Amino acid sequence: TATVDCSDYPKPACTLEYMPFCGSDSKTYSNKCNFCNAVVDSNGTLTLSHFGKC
């Protein structure tokens, strides 16, 4: 499975960069920052399904 290191994301303001990530919740996150914030908010229950749109 694909993994993403979110340890360097202490909830910064995310950029508008578009590099989509598909989460295990079947939602597409626009970039790593938005995905990592969602991972933190989920207490680690959200994982990466794959890179790219869901």
Curated annotation (Swiss-Prot):
It comes from the Eukaryota. SUPFAM superfamilies: Kazal-type serine protease inhibitors (SSF100895). It is found in: Secreted. GO terms for cellular component: extracellular region. Disulfide bonds join 6-36, 14-33, 22-54. Residues 4-54 form the Kazal-like domain. Gene3D superfamilies: 3.30.60.30. The record marks 16-17 as: Reactive bond 3. InterPro entries: Bifunctional_prot_inhibitor, Kazal_dom, Kazal_dom_sf, Prot_inh_Kazal-m. The keyword Repeat applies. PROSITE patterns: KAZAL_1, KAZAL_2. GO terms for molecular function: serine-type endopeptidase inhibitor activity. Transmembrane segments: none annotated. Keywords: Disulfide bond, Glycoprotein, Protease inhibitor, Repeat, Secreted, Serine protease inhibitor. Glycans are attached at residue 43. Avian ovomucoid consists of three homologous, tandem Kazal family inhibitory domains. This is Ovomucoid. It comes from Grus japonensis (Japanese crane). The lineage of its organism: Eukaryota, Metazoa, Chordata, Craniata, Vertebrata.
